[in-house]
């Protein structure tokens, strides 16, 4: 492997001059020397040592992807199809443009600060942070940041890429109501952030025609599988009376479908099911899952491109980019 000193010897300049050209410090270097060094670098296929690049104080070309949670649905976060596709999209987009992606565990804010500082990351894309955690991090770390699916208490004060969660489940509520499911239930793992917006869309769609939808129709299930299955067993008689369930994620919807199948309950003849995300598994399960489609790939691309613009110094007037969603009708709802 060719060394920096070898390049300097070929160009007839000092090692420091070569280093300055590589790192963009060319104010005191003539154009002729820059051109000569650049030509030799290309001819020799010189690849700079990443450690040197990062310590130079110039762009490391590293993007940090922060996961604010290690576990989702009771499993490792990266096992979830939504998280996996999102992170994979960001990585592909970054590598296509000459950037590197570093995955950072974000449950502890100090870990994010430490990793981002040590590796001189140029910016962060953050999944799983709320407004409070974002401000805690931004006070400790001066880096460009884009959040994904974050919700503020009031107006947005940070860059966010999300979807229209309210509209997605409003469409579900309208659809189920039109199919005659006046007592359908909404099932989620929390009553916060995106789950809260989705529940509100469901509730208001159900109430559009004067059908009161009380909070008792919001079913909160545990975040781990054993607890969820126990909850499904406990609520099975109520589920059968409701005849339709709207879930806040495809994962939970498909898990519930499998549970019902094991109990001998027919989907959709006895219980209709709707999910949210349109994950790759929505078409694998039988019956195929009716769900709300969100473009996860586009979300990852938008987050990456937005961060790169911020790193380049562009100002972003619109703080919250919200992608549209649409209901995909398949086979898990009996019309």
Label each PLM-derived region with a short phrase.
Residues 91-105, 183-185, 203-227:
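Short beta-strand elements in bilobed, periplasmic/extracellular small-molecule ligand-binding domains
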Residues 1-60:
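N-terminal helix-turn-helix DNA-binding module of bacterial transcription factors
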Residues 170-210, 319-332:
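An alpha-beta-alpha
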Residues 2, 58, 62-174, 234-241, ...:
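Alpha-helical recognition/docking segments in bacterial nutrient-uptake
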Residues 233-335:
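Flexible loop/turn connectors
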Residues 160-186, 226-233, 253, 294-312:
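Hydrophobic alpha-helical segments within soluble ligand-binding/sensing domains
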């Amino acid at each position: 492997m060719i060394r920096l000193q070898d390049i300097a010897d070929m160009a007839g300049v000092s090692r420091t001059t070569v280093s300055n050209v590589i790192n963009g410090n060319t104010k005191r270097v003539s154009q002729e020397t820059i051109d000569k060094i650049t030509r030799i670098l290309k001819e020799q296929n010189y690849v700079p040592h990443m450690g040197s690049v990062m310590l130079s104080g110039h762009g490391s070309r590293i993007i940090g992807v922060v996961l604010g949670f290690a576990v989702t649905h009771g499993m490792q976060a990266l096992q979830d199809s939504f998280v996996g596709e999102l992170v994979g999209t960001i990585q592909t987009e970054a590598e296509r443009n000459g950037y590197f992606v570093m995955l950072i565990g974000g449950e502890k804010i100090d870990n994010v600060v430490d990793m981002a500082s040590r590796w001189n990351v140029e910016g962060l894309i953050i999944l799983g942070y709320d407004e409070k955690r974002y401000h805690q991090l931004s006070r400790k770390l001066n880096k460009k940041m884009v959040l994904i699916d974050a919700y503020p208490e009031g107006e947005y004060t940070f860059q966010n890429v999300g979807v229209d969660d309210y509209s997605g489940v409003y469409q579900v509520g309208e659809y189920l109501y039109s199919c005659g499911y006046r007592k359908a239930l909404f099932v989620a793992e929390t009553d916060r952030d995106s789950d809260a917006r989705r529940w509100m869309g469901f509730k208001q769609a159900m109430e559009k025609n004067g059908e009161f939808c009380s909070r008792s129709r919001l079913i909160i299930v545990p975040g781990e599988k054993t607890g969820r299955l126990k909850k499904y067993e406990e609520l099975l008689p109520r589920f059968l009376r409701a005849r339709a369930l709207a879930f806040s994620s495809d994962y939970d919807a498909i898990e519930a479908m499998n549970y019902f199948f094991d109990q001998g309950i027919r989907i959709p003849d006895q219980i209709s099911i709707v999910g949210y995300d349109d994950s790759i598994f929505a078409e694998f399960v039988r019956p195929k899952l009716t769900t709300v489609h969100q473009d996860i790939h586009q979300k990852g691309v938008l987050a990456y491109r937005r961060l790169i613009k911020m790193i380049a110094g562009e100002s972003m007037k619109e703080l919250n980019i919200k992608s549209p969603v649409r209901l995909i009708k398949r086979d898990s709802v009996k019309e």
